[in-house]
């Protein structure tokens, strides 16, 4: 923990709060090493440096971990009920938080632990409620019936970030839809025949000579009898499939947009178009578990969606309406956490209106108030922000900030800080009120983190001094989900940007370039690199709490082959320096143990050089050049120091680390020390070592402090 200088200059940053789902992974440690570097570096320049630490409650992710733990005990969350289940989650949170803080301390990070925050602590809850209520009362939050990514296993809406695309070979079915009052038919091509019960139109391209004369006619939907219009829209690709596209607004995002454009709605078994958006009424054919509902006729109702597909195809064959089946490459959306196929589904959710907020956030980047490093990431930022949609902020789970809204028996909704404030604000009588069951998307509370963690909505000393923060270190994968939203919320509630510089790191992958994940069995705990771990413990760690069956054996085989002797201990400094050497401006970063060995050797070199110098008497701590070798090393030191400061300012720690390595090993050890040995002129060895220790300290704090104590015995380098 730093003893902070009383300086008007200040440097501040917030930790991207790790989820209380378990322990830290390599990506966390990589970013925290970078953040710790900048905290130490600015502190040593006499700047009041502050790094806000804390963890994230991580709604769905944490709830799933606890549900899986219960499952292993033969229990479910429904057996426990909401309150008892939440008690279990709080217990898990305490366990996980203990592990995480222990890991952070072992990485040597310099934070003030007594100012630790949690995105679900009492003060943070107050801030989250204030943000929600204020946005609602400014007409920037609303409740709407819209299409969302629905996870039928978790029975909740999930964000785009929590959906992964599985590319695979699938099938495209050509189905005959008879034209009403005609012997003709239109052949539609679809990868999802099971959704035909929700069809509300057939779309063709108005420039397609094959079909344009059918626009305005109706087709009869097989099995249902509903009459649906043939509409002309240039969205339809004439080259894809048959050129006729079934439009199912209740179960496809593109179809939803088309359905909305024509305000499709059903009246007495006939789907009509309208120029009034409020007429739009998409049809939902699935339950929350993705079973067919009562909108689907027998014998297809009350079946799992994939059984519906099978039954529909069989019946289409029987009726000779299945014209053709062909191979087709498809992209299947799966829940990142559940691995279940995501269903686009209509449901009531809460939304934030983002268009106006996004414009303000864009201005902040355009006018240089917020700068991305490397600069090319602002293109990614603008690409997302220029196509922003209203943000779905509700989740149908139990763990999280419960939405501060109450409903009465007549279907009215009231929003406020608590039930008493709601009754007062809306002048309500003693009618029964029920609180909204849904909780907020984790990203909603996370978007308040830069100012909420510093004390907002209270005007605390830290909030006044350290907000806006100086630097945000984050991964490119959450530029939109977190960075952009922090900017929108910060400008909305404080009128200021949340940070000035955004240092975007690449993602740490394994030596083969694969993403590190529990299911791939390639995760390495950074603490095991520091202290080492034997093979049996490593196997146990990698195969524990796997959420998918059958993986343990495969992961065990892979681990035994890759690490026959377990993992050696490399020490904190070698791990940190390896991370800095990897802090390139590339998107993907491969982590190799060979590089780690190189930096452990470097630490040994530093230690041996210091011990060698310590054999000589210390004549002075002040460097005064007495010969050509002294002048040369002084000149080289000044040049490398200037270059390193430049690299640090430009967020190129990879270049800076390389400069340190090359200077210490190649110039100081191999040339200057050897020259001093030969000439016997050793008076400047101690003073130059001292300068180097100060320069190197943010890169390798432990060994530099230990050497300084051994050789100079004059207190911490952090005070130099």
Each model region followed by its residue ranges:
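N-terminal, positively charged nucleic-acid-binding surface of large information/translation enzymes
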Residues: 1-207, 248-261, 265-295, 305, ...
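Flexible, glycine/threonine-enriched loop-and-boundary segments that flank and lead into catalytic domains
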Residues: 7, 157-185, 390-391, 401, ...
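Active-site-adjacent bridging/hinge elements
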Residues: 7-15, 37, 73-76, 101-108, ...
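Glycine- and acidic
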Residues: 16-24, 82-86, 111-118, 239-245, ...
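Structured ligand/cofactor/substrate-binding pocket environments in proteins
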Residues: 27-39, 55-56, 124-127, 185-315, ...
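Alpha-helix initiation and N-capping motif
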Residues: 59, 63, 82, 97, ...
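Helix-rich, typically C-terminal accessory recognition domains appended to large enzymatic cores
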Residues: 103-111, 123-156, 170, 385-409, ...
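Short Cys/His-rich metal-coordination motifs, predominantly Zn2+-binding knuckles/fingers
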Residues: 154, 182, 224, 338, ...
């Amino acid at each position: 923990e730093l003893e902070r200088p009383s300086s008007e200059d200040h440097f501040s940053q917030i930790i991207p709060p790790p989820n209380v789902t378990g322990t830290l992974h390599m990506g966390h440690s990589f970013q925290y090493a970078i953040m710790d570097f900048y905290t130490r570096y600015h502190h040593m320049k006499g700047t009041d440096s502050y790094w806000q630490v804390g963890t994230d409650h991580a709604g769905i992710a944490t709830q799933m971990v606890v549900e899986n733990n219960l499952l292993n005990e033969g229990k479910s969350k429904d057996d426990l009920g909401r309150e008892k289940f939440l008690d279990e989650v709080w217990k898990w949170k305490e366990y996980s938080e203990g592990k995480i803080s222990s890991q952070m301390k072992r990485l040597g990070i310099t934070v003030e632990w007594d100012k630790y925050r949690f995105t679900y602590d009492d003060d943070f809850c107050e801030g989250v409620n204030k943000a929600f209520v204020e946005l609602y009362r400014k007409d920037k939050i609303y409740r709407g019936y819209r299409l969302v990514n629905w996870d039928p296993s978790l029975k909740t809406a999930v964000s785009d970030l929590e959906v992964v695309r599985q590319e695979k070979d699938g099938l495209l079915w050509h189905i005959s839809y008879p034209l009403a009052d005609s012997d003709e038919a239109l052949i539609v091509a679809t990868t999802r025949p099971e959704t035909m019960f929700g069809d509300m139109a057939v779309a063709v391209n108005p420039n397609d000579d094959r079909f344009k004369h059918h626009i305005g006619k109706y087709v009869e939907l097989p099995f249902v009898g509903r009459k649906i219009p043939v509409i002309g829209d240039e969205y339809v690709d004439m080259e894809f499939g048959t050129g006729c596209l079934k439009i199912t607004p209740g179960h496809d995002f593109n179809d939803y947009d088309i359905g909305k454009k024509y305000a499709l709605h059903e009246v007495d078994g006939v789907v009509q178009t309208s120029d009034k958006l409020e007429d739009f009424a998409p049809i939902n054919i699935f339950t929350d578990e993705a079973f067919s509902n009562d909108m689907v006729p027998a014998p297809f109702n009350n079946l799992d969606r994939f059984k519906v597909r099978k039954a529909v195809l069989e019946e289409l064959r029987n009726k000779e309406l299945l014209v053709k089946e062909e191979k087709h490459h498809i992209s299947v959306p799966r829940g990142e956490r559940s691995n279940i196929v995501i269903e686009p589904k209509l449901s009531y959710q809460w939304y934030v209106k983002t268009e106006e907020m996004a414009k303000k956030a864009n201005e902040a980047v355009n006018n240089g108030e917020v700068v991305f490093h490397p600069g090319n990431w602002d293109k990614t930022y603008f690409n997302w922000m220029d196509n922003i949609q209203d943000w779905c902020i509700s989740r149908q789970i139990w763990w999280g900030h419960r939405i501060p809204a109450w409903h009465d028996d007549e279907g009215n909704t009231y929003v406020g800080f608590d039930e008493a404030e709601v009754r007062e604000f809306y002048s309500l009588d003693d009618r029964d009120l029920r609180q909204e069951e849904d909780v907020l998307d984790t990203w909603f509370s996370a978007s308040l983190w830069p100012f909420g963690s510093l004390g907002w909505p209270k005007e605390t000393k830290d909030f006044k001094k350290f907000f806006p923060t100086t630097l945000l270190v984050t991964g490119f994968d959450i530029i939109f989900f977190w960075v952009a939203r922090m900017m929108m919320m910060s400008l909305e509630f404080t009128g200021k940007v949340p940070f000035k510089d955004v240092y975007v790191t690449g993602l740490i992958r394994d030596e083969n370039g694969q993403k590190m994940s529990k299911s791939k069995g390639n995760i390495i705990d950074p603490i095991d690199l520091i202290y080492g771990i034997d093979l049996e413990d490593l196997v146990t760690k990698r195969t524990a709490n796997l959420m998918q069956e059958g993986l343990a054996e495969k992961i065990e085989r892979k681990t035994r082959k890759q690490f026959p002797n377990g993992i050696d201990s490399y020490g904190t400094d070698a791990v940190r320096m390896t991370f800095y050497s990897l802090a390139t401006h590339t998107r993907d970063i491969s982590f190799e143990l060979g590089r780690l060995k190189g930096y452990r050797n470097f630490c040994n070199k530093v230690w041996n050089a210091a011990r060698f110098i310590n054999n000589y008497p210390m004549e002075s701590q002040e460097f005064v050049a007495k010969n050509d070798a002294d002048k040369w090393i002084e000149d080289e030191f000044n040049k490398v120091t200037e270059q390193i400061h430049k690299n640090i300012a430009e967020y190129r720690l990879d270049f800076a680390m390389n400069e340190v390595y090359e200077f210490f090993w190649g110039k100081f050890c191999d040339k200057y020390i050897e020259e001093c040995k030969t000439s016997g002129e050793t008076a400047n060895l101690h003073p130059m070592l001292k300068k180097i220790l100060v320069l190197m300290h943010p890169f390798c704090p432990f060994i530099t402090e230990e050497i300084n104590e051994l050789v100079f015995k004059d207190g911490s380098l952090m005070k130099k």
